[in-house]
């Protein structure tokens, strides 16, 4: 060892801890560029560790020595190595400062990692085991900490792992709390590498869990926040380690940790740790939780926690806020039977409480649960609305705000159902927006925003004058960017609902919004500007391209400037604005592509790690690794740095999601002029399909399918015909793009673990097949059928079980039959049925052989207790009948029996779908079912006298129309038609207009007396469908119906004259 070098190195280490920034910078540079690059620096550092009197320098020397061990230890002479090993153990035992002892312990572990595999330092284990039994607490603590460091650092075989488990199982009961906690950490390190195939090791490990729980309860009871965090970190490790470790103990673990979360005697910071564990448990062990039927006790406990006060800072964790987050996740990951229904029962009781905190918790629980249980919420709206209305009228401000938040969330998730109650809800919310303080007023404005978006043009018209006067007034006179943002968003929703009825308010609104585009250069200003860009897009869509044209170029330039600003939210809103303008201007948007598409590419190309270092001055990837390894440094600061890193990554990921989605939208609406950008767009999007964030994957895949479908359309391929091989030639370029999209789609599906992504993939596949026909399938028809069958059998990887639980013992496996489906599960299966339907449409009669395989799997869902699944099964079989047409004949008797039973189902949606499907079966099957028509009519009769389901009446009319078209002689037309005509026009399911008006046209050509005598009273119906929304009729049917009306118009001139729009059409 060079004495002079060691002296200089010591001086530099002293300089590194000086209070002078300049000295620190100079010392760090010298250490990195010169001194620590010398092989002899390791020996000098060991010397400084043992001799320096300053504990900070000793600690720093140990940190640097640990980093250098793997570089220089092998070059040290064997005799010197032995001397260092002995001396290192000695100085570690004698070190008085615990943080320095830990640093020394890490050095011992680093050397052990190098020595033990080579059969060196064999005496270390015996020394440490002996030290764990020493009378001196500090020696035991040191020994266990070194053992923990070795367990964390060294690759141990199963025999050594078992020795460590057995040793920690003894030290976990030590009289020293520090020893006990460190023992738990050591066991946590072992859990990360433990594999379940060694049963002896697994059972020994499981035997330590009760002891670990006792340590957790102890540190929680004494309020030791740091120790609690260390132990909770270990329990969090269990959730992503071998599933077999805690599978048998999970119920007991949840019970204890839930108790901690719910105890007001426990420090809030520790309770937040417990709730964070519950959140992770829901994410990673949802099927196990469901199999253990823990959903109900969990949600009830969490609702109790939700009654507590929340902190003012919405970004700050507190027990109540985390409890609501947990309820949100529970509703998504567990079935409604275990979460929503127990939660709603408790919410009903809470809402009657004299304590405002309970009434507030009831409303907030309903609000957070709706995203994962929207179908269940929709089915219970008659019982939910009274709770919300009472909340809106509550005398407590916090309860009123909670009611607004709940109503907003429900309106976002199920807008159609909520919009039916606008007359009851909107006046209450208007009043709160006008008369309450800023806090409630802001929530009321957000609620208005959500409610308006669900209204149609006719529903909003009565509110528009008063609403726009109030909103524009608030926008012009409020000084608060936050309030302005809420108001601007509400204006956007009003425009979205009003469509061209918004034109009278257009100029004043644009003038007011324009002022908000020149805001302060801070987060609030950028947020406001982003929201205004969203609103301007909604207005452009409402008023149309001609009215918006004077503003277009300037706003596109402003949006482009927004993209250059370092603010993800503003960039996202600019991307959305471009996508909306593409929808409005279509091919006329082409001149702007040369600037906009590269900007979208730039966003997608962002490297999260580069941006991380650039934006927050964060360390490099290697330095982050060192931060994670260096537990002897300030862990709290490290956590903050990593949180900042994750925050930046999340913001960039969400920006990429929006950019990917905007590319697909722009491609779809601009069409042919986008073709020069198509190839690089596909390349960028394909790269995004492997992104870590599911939102990016989903947007990228959706946009890829839109790009492929759009290219098919712009190539003007003749209308496809059902069947494979292709009957209509398709250019190779079209085949190639579909092949590329299919490949990354199947690659993603092979390892996708997010149900929402898998669901979206199958929906896009189905839509593309229906639009573009069999060319979409290429050579992958069998592969697609395999994926769909896996999903229908609940055997796809995304349905296979909890994340990380691929190595349970056989008795621990949770089968799909043991748990009810979540609504997310049901959506995935529904999307698989969509693909089956699409294949039937694209392949026609040739799909019949495949349908023989699919049919039993689909019909199994009709046996489900879940009404939605029964409805799905009936609709799927009916749609397939419509796709394969006469090829349904061999299935007729089975399918007919299914539909007849479904027409009497307890659920209205099932009966509605059965009516639709029965019509298709009777229309296309070549087996004569006319003898059953009267039985079918009998089962349809209640549809005309009762409220069965939203679409039930329309489906019944469609069914009857098909029966008449197929064999009118089997129907008492003179009795049936007056009833059908009295219920027109159709209001809910416009698809049924096709059989209805084909039937009317057919009877008219025959001059059927029953039809002819009702033609006069049908004029208002014809006026409604011919002058109403275009989606009511396809072009061909519209033309035929218009011709018929022109023929009969002279006979009914006095009636026709009451409908000016119809008169204009007839001229």
From Swiss-Prot:
One Pfam family this sequence matches: IBN_N
HEAT repeat windows: 159-196, 379-416, 420-457, 591-633, 890-927, 1013-1050
GO MF entry, a single one: nuclear import signal receptor activity
Alphabetic keyword roster: Cytoplasm, Nucleus, Protein transport, Repeat, Transport
InterPro entries: ARM-like (IPR011989), ARM-type_fold (IPR016024), HEAT_type_2 (IPR021133), Importin-beta_N (IPR001494), Importin_beta (IPR040122)
Positions in coiled-coil regions: none
Importin N-terminal domain location: 27-94
GO cellular component: cytoplasm; cytosol; nuclear envelope; nuclear periphery; nucleus
Superkingdom of source: Eukaryota
Predominant localisation class: cytoplasm
Compartmental location: Cytoplasm; Nucleus; Nucleus envelope
Example GO BP: protein import into nucleus
PROSITE patterns registered for this protein in UniProt: HEAT_REPEAT, IMPORTIN_B_NT
Protein family according to the UniProt entry: Belongs to the importin beta family.
Function: Required for nuclear protein import, its predominant substrate seems to be ribosomal proteins. Binds to nucleoporins and the GTP-bound form of gsp1 (Ran).
Protein name: Probable importin subunit beta-4
Gene: kap123
């Amino acid at each position: 060892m060079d004495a002079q070098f060691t002296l200089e190195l010591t001086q530099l280490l002293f300089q590194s801890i000086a209070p002078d920034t300049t000295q620190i910078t100079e010392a760090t540079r010298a250490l990195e560029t010169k001194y620590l690059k010398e092989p002899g620096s390791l020996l000098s550092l060991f010397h400084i560790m043992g001799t320096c009197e300053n504990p900070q320098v000793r600690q720093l020397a140990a940190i640097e020595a640990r980093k250098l061990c793997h570089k220089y230890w092998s070059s040290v002479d064997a005799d010197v190595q032995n001397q260092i090993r002995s001396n290192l153990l000695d100085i570690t035992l004698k070190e008085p400062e615990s943080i320095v002892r830990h640093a020394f312990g890490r050095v011992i572990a680093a050397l052990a990692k190098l020595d033990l595999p080579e059969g060196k330092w064999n005496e270390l284990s015996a020394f440490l085991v002996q030290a764990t039994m020493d009378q001196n607490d500090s020696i035991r603590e040191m020994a266990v900490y070194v053992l923990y460091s070795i367990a964390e650092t060294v690759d141990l075989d199963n025999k050594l792992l078992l020795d460590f488990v057995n040793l920690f199982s003894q030290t976990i009961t030590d009289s020293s709390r520090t020893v006990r906690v460190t023992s738990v950490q050591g066991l946590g390190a072992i859990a990360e590498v433990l594999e379940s195939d060694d049963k002896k090791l697994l059972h020994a490990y499981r035997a330590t869990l009760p002891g670990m729980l006792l340590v957790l309860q102890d540190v929680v009871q004494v309020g030791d926040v740091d120790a609690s965090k260390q132990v909770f970190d270990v329990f969090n490790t269990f959730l992503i380690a071998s599933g077999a470790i805690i599978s048998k103990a999970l119920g007991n673990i949840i019970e204890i940790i839930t108790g901690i979360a719910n105890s007001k005697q426990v420090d809030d910071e520790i309770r937040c740790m417990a709730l964070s564990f519950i959140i992770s448990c829901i994410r990673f062990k949802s099927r196990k939780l469901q199999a253990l039927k823990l959903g109900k006790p969990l949600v009830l406990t969490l609702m109790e926690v939700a009654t507590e006060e929340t902190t003012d800072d919405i970004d700050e964790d507190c027990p109540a806020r985390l409890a609501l987050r947990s309820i949100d996740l529970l509703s998504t990951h567990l079935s409604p039977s275990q979460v929503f229904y127990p939660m709603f029962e408790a919410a009903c009781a809470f809402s009657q409480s004299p304590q405002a905190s309970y009434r507030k918790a009831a409303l907030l629980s309903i609000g957070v649960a709706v995203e994962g249980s929207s179908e269940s919420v929709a089915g219970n709206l008659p019982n939910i609305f009274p709770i919300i209305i009472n909340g809106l009228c509550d005398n407590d401000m916090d309860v009123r705000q909670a009611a607004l938040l709940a109503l907003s969330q429900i309106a976002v998730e199920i807008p159609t159902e909520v919009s039916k109650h606008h007359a009851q809800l909107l006046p209450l919310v208007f009043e709160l927006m006008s008369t309450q303080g800023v806090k409630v007023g802001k929530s009321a404005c957000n609620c208005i925003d959500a409610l308006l978006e669900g209204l149609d043009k006719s529903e909003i018209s009565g509110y528009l004058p008063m609403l726009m006067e109030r909103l524009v007034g608030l926008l012009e006179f409020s000084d608060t960017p936050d309030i302005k943002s809420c108001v601007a968003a509400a204006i956007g929703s009003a425009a979205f609902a009003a469509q061209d009825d918004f034109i009278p308010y257009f100029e004043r609104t644009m003038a007011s919004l324009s002022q908000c585009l020149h805001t302060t250069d801070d987060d609030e200003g950028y947020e406001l500007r982003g929201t205004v860009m969203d609103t301007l897009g909604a207005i452009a869509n409402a008023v149309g391209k001609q009215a918006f044209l004077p503003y277009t170029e300037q706003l596109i330039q402003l949006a482009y400037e927004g993209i250059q600003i370092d603010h993800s939210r503003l960039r996202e809103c600019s991307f959305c604005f471009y996508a909306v303008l593409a929808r409005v201007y279509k091919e006329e948007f082409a001149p702007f592509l040369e600037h906009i598409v590269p900007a979208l590419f730039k966003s997608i190309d962002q490297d999260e790690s580069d941006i991380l270092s650039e934006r927050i001055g964060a360390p490099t990837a290697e330095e982050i690794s060192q931060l994670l390894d260096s537990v002897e440094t300030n862990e709290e600061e490290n956590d903050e740095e990593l949180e900042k890193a994750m925050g930046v990554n999340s913001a960039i990921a969400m920006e990429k999601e929006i950019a990917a989605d905007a590319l697909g939208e722009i491609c779809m609406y601009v069409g042919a002029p986008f073709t020069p950008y198509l190839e690089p767009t596909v390349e960028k999007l394909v790269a995004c399909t492997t992104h870590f964030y599911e939102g990016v994957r989903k947007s990228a895949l959706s946009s890829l399918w839109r790009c492929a479908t759009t290219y098919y359309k712009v190539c003007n391929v003749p209308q496809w015909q059902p069947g494979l091989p292709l009957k209509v030639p398709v250019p190779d370029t079209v085949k190639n793009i579909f092949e590329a999209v299919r490949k990354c789609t199947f690659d993603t599906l092979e390892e996708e673990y997010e149900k929402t992504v898998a669901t979206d993939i199958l929906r896009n596949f189905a839509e593309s097949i229906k639009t573009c026909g069999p060319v979409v399938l290429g050579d992958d028809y069998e592969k697609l059928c395999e994926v769909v069958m896996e999903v229908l059998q609940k055997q796809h990887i995304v349905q296979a079980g909890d994340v990380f639980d691929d190595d349970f013992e056989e008795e621990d496996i949770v089968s799909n039959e043991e748990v009810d489906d979540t609504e997310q599960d049901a959506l995935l299966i529904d999307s698989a049925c969509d693909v089956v339907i699409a294949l039937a449409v694209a392949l026609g009669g040739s799909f019949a052989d495949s349908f023989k395989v699919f049919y039993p799997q689909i019909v199994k869902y009709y046996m489900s207790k879940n009404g939605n699944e029964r409805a799905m099964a009936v609709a799927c079989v009916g749609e397939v009948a419509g796709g394969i047409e006469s090829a349904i004949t061999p299935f007729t008797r089975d399918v007919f029996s299914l539909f007849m039973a479904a027409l009497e189902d307890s659920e209205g949606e099932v009966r509605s779908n059965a009516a639709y499907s029965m019509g298709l079966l009777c229309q296309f099957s070549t087996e004569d079912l006319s003898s059953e028509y009267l039985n079918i009519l009998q089962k349809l009769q209640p549809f005309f006298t009762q409220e069965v389901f939203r679409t039930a009446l329309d489906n019944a009319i469609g069914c009857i129309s098909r029966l008449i078209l197929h064999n009118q002689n089997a129907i008492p037309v003179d009795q049936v038609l007056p009833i059908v005509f009295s219920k027109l026009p159709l209001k809910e399911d416009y698809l049924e207009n096709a059989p209805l008006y084909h039937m009317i046209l057919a009877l008219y050509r025959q001059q059927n007396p029953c039809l002819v005598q009702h033609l006069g009273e049908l004029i208002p119906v014809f006026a409604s469908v011919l002058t109403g929304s275009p989606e009511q009729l396809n072009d061909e049917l519209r033309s035929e119906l218009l011709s018929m009306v022109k023929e009969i118009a002279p006979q009914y001139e006095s009636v026709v004259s009451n409908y000016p729009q119809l008169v204009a059409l007839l001229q």
